[in-house]
Regions:
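N-terminal assembly/interaction segments in proteins that build large macromolecular machines
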Residues: 11-186
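Single conserved hydrophobic/aromatic residue that forms the stacking wall/gate
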Residues: 1-6, 10
């Protein structure tokens, strides 16, 4: 039996762990109980649990999703990340993750494509793979980085259509940014 003061500390720990990890309340309680209240160890338990949950979801089909773009000067990236349902694709947490994927791809030396090697290399960049595991556990659906493409030119422009269902980047050499935007009819 816990004292009232101990119970309050425990509740605060559960709340803090939830805020840190985005994991569910019961998962946080279980992790804290398993680690006797050690927050760092509880985070590790949740990471392992998230990886196990992700492994179980790998056979599911993730056919919904969105595209996001990232632009820096004369380089642009469009990235597509899929989820199982359109409900999740509209989720702010998921959309922020997709933007993180696009930003990470932009900062990387990878050119993209749908081939597995570039996707695997991208996931190995800046802890993106760990973030994918975390978001899969938090959101509760299979998430997959489907593809990304990077373009470079004298001028680049980007466009997202249909709430993120279609993303376009265009690069032009010997042209201005205005000419690239005109080519996209912006």
């Amino acid at each position: 039996v816990r004292s009232s003061a101990a119970s309050d500390v425990y509740k605060r720990q559960v709340k803090e762990l939830r805020e840190m990890t985005g994991a569910g309340m019961m998962d946080c309680k279980k992790a804290l109980t398993e680690t006797n209240g050690d927050m760092d160890a509880a985070v590790d338990v949740l990471k392992k649990s998230g990886a196990a949950k992700m492994e179980k979801k790998q056979s599911r089909i993730a056919a919904e999703g969105i595209a996001r773009v990232a632009v820096n000067g004369n380089v642009a990236v469009v990235a597509e990340v899929n989820s199982e349902t359109d409900f999740v694709a509209k989720n702010e947490t998921f959309q922020e993750f997709v933007q993180t994927v696009a930003d990470t791809a932009l900062a990387s030396d990878l050119n993209g494509g749908a081939n597995g090697e570039d996707i695997e290399a991208l996931l190995a960049t800046n802890g993106l793979s760990d973030l994918l595991v975390e978001k899969t556990a938090t959101i509760g659906e299979k998430l997959s980085v489907r593809r990304f493409a990077k373009v470079t030119g004298d001028a680049v422009a980007s466009y997202i259509h249909g709430g993120g269902r279609i993303g376009v980047v265009i690069a032009a050499d010997g042209a201005s940014d205005d000419a690239a935007k005109e080519a996209l009819c912006l």
